[in-house]
């Protein structure tokens, strides 16, 4: 149940690759996740947008989809976004919104793990400077 609640709060559900956006209902059923009332299996791949040059984001997402994945999991690496206390950078290579929109264009869902700790062999676990 805890995992289900965590997923409910951290999943960003996107529509298909078409331009129109549709609201989805994601919930935990008795023995399965439900998307719009139908059983849904999360088939997720982990991608670290900070480790992939922005020019390759689309290709990597396509590769995940080709492997049968329907979801991309991402961490937010706070030590990249807040290199100086109180000053945040979500531009260019650090543009989480652009990465998520790109996943949406490929018909993928995204699970965002905001941290602050990152369990991905990352310096200081991704904690922002000054911690």
Identify the meaning behind each predicted range.
Residues 4-14:
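Bacterial N-terminal signal peptides
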Residues 57-130:
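Aromatic-lined substrate-binding rim segments of carbohydrate-active enzymes
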